[in-house]
A protein has these predicted regions:
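A structural "domain/chain start" motif
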Residues: 1-60, 168-178
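Generic short beta-strand segments
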Residues: 26-32, 92-99, 134-136
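Structured segments of extracytoplasmic/periplasmic soluble domains
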Residues: 30, 60-71, 96, 159, ...
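Short acidic, glycine/proline-rich loop/turn micro-motifs
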Residues: 35-41, 101-104, 142-146
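Short secondary-structure boundary motifs at beta->alpha junctions and helix caps
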Residues: 43-52, 121-173
Length: 178
């Protein structure tokens, strides 16, 4: 089992000032039965995370946008009030997994992959903009612990959130609050 929730590394960043410019809705995610997010091929068992990837990834993307100076708020997928915000970010998680396998000898490799498609919509945009971001992480050790699984998944999820925010900023879909 993968313990805990996904989180951003602690940073000393003041929240963006002003009215929210972006709302980040929960991302869609087709969850596997019983929270399975991967496989331990060495011990022939599933890897389970009881978290909610769609909400966790939306939290991470909103967090990165906030760290970048964008006044962003989080709402559920069907939350009311999103119409009043200039840009709505939504999307779907295409891949969210962590697997382990022995690579010969004493080494065990833990690999995590996250793929996210973000869609930006709003009255100020010429039309919906869609970007897909994927990242993978690989860790090697003598044995794997639940914390190793979490670290691989958290590192990969944060890298995807950072890249998604970077692409939104570069495309000038969102911008830091002044």
């Amino acid at each position: 089992n993968v313990p805990g929730d996904l989180a951003r590394p602690a940073r000393a960043v003041a929240p963006a000032a002003g009215a929210p410019r972006v709302v980040v809705a929960d991302f869609s995610y087709a969850a596997a039965p019983d929270g399975v997010v991967g496989r331990d091929f060495d011990r022939v068992r599933p890897i389970v995370w009881k978290g909610e990837p769609g909400k966790a990834m939306a939290d991470l993307v909103a967090g990165v946008l906030g760290e970048s100076g964008v006044a962003a708020v989080r709402l559920g997928a069907d939350a009311l009030g999103a119409e009043a915000v200039p840009v709505r970010i939504s999307g779907g998680i295409r891949r969210f997994e962590v697997n382990t396998r022995r690579t010969g000898g004493l080494s065990v490799v833990t690999e995590a992959t996250v793929s996210l498609t973000v869609t930006a919509e709003g009255p100020g945009l010429s039309g919906p903009m869609e970007k897909t971001v994927t990242s993978s992480t690989s860790l090697s050790d003598l044995f794997v612990t639940p914390d190793d699984l979490r670290e691989a998944l958290m590192s990969t999820a944060n890298a995807v959130a950072e890249e998604a925010a970077r692409k939104l900023l570069e495309a000038k879909v969102v911008s830091p609050s002044s």
